[in-house]
């Protein structure tokens, strides 16, 4: 089974610190590598994380403020240098097309990789291609900003002892899958009689935003919500004026959405540590973590 997990490559906001790089988040899932908001220095962060950049197959840019996109050009150039054979899909707000182009073509180099652009100009399902579904929602920030939800499909899992008891084997199994019922020895066997549905996992990624309904919609029942929490409550006035959230506000969104786990990120450089973020959020939503550079959050498939 391929690795399934979220690796934090950076978790600072506008300004990196000695201990936190600009944000960048790698989701390895179902054989693909999804890179969210590669800030400045992302290529180097892969080295420290001991992860080959070639795992990246899709890049998501929430918006075109520098701390969320300055690493895009260098990542594309690195993938080009490594001569990856798979296409690189890039998703971003359509209104930022000119900024995407400036980052992509900011230096002289011979591009040989296949870059497939997906400029997003509407909310809803962006792609649905079997391994997972990509959805976007417009967040409440100073510029066009997208939040993302990645959801894998539900799958049917057979119960071996019930399959055996029903006398099912061979080609009739495929007929059962296709039709939902088969006749075996004068008995009708329904798919539900010998199987159960494994609920597909989902993760929501929320970059810069004020609290809004779109966050709740994106994160509804998600296994993980990766959410910006730039400030503590004592600086809530800054959060409001800069269209960001506090740790408490992020926790309130997670609680409303009934997510399983909340990971806070995008911390202001004014804070040296993140313990207080967890404390403030934990009063609202207990299963909360503060993102740490190079920390990975594994999530094996749901058993049911």
UniProtKB/Swiss-Prot annotation:
Pfam families: Lactamase_B (PF00753). InterPro entries: Metallo-B-lactamas (IPR001279), RibonucZ/Hydroxyglut_hydro (IPR036866), RNase_Z/BN (IPR013471). The active site is at residue 67. It catalyses: Endonucleolytic cleavage of RNA, removing extra 3' nucleotides from tRNA precursor, generating 3' termini of tRNAs. A 3'-hydroxy group is left at the tRNA terminus and a 5'-phosphoryl group is left at the trailer molecule. It comes from Chlamydia trachomatis serovar L2 (strain ATCC VR-902B / DSM 19102 / 434/Bu). GO terms for molecular function: 3'-tRNA processing endoribonuclease activity; zinc ion binding. Its EC number is 3.1.26.11. Binds 2 Zn(2+) ions. Keywords: Endonuclease, Hydrolase, Metal-binding, Nuclease, tRNA processing, Zinc. Zn(2+) 2 binds at residues 67-68, 208, 266. Its cofactor is Zn(2+). HAMAP family: RNase_Z_BN. Zn(2+) 1 binds at residues 63, 65, 141, 208. It is an enzyme of class 3 (hydrolase). Belongs to the RNase Z family. Homodimer. This is Ribonuclease Z. Zinc phosphodiesterase, which displays some tRNA 3'-processing endonuclease activity. Probably involved in tRNA maturation, by removing a 3'-trailer from precursor tRNA.
């Amino acid at each position: 089974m391929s690795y399934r997990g979220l690796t934090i490559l950076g978790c600072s906001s506008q300004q990196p610190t000695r201990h936190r790089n600009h944000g960048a988040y790698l989701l390895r899932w179902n054989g693909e590598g999804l890179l969210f908001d590669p800030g400045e220095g992302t290529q180097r962060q892969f080295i420290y994380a001991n992860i080959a950049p070639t795992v990246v197959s899709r890049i998501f840019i929430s918006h075109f403020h520098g701390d969320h996109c300055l690493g895009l050009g260098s990542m594309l150039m690195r993938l080009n240098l490594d001569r990856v054979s798979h296409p690189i899909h890039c998703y971003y707000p359509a209104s930022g097309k000119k900024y995407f182009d400036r980052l992509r073509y900011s230096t002289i180099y011979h591009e040989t990789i296949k870059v497939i652009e997906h400029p997003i100009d509407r909310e809803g399902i962006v792609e649905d291609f079997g391994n997972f579904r990509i959805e976007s929602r417009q967040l409440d920030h100073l510029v066009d900003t997208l939040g993302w939800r990645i959801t894998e499909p539900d799958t049917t899992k057979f119960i071996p002892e019930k399959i055996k008891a029903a006398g099912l084997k061979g080609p009739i199994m495929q007929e059962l899958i296709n039709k939902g019922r088969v006749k075996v020895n004068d008995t009708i066997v329904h798919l539900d009689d010998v199987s159960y549905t494994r609920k597909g996992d989902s993760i929501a990624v929320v970059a810069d935003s004020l609290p809004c309904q779109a966050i709740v919609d994106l994160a509804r029942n998600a296994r993980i919500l990766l959410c910006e929490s730039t400030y503590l409550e004592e600086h809530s006035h800054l959060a409001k004026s800069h269209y960001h959230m506090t740790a408490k506000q992020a926790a309130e969104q997670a609680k409303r959405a009934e997510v399983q786990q909340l990971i806070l990120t995008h911390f202001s450089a004014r804070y040296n540590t993140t313990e207080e973020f967890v404390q403030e959020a934990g009063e609202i939503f207990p299963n909360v973590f503060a993102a740490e550079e190079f920390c990975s959050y594994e999530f094996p498939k749901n058993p049911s």
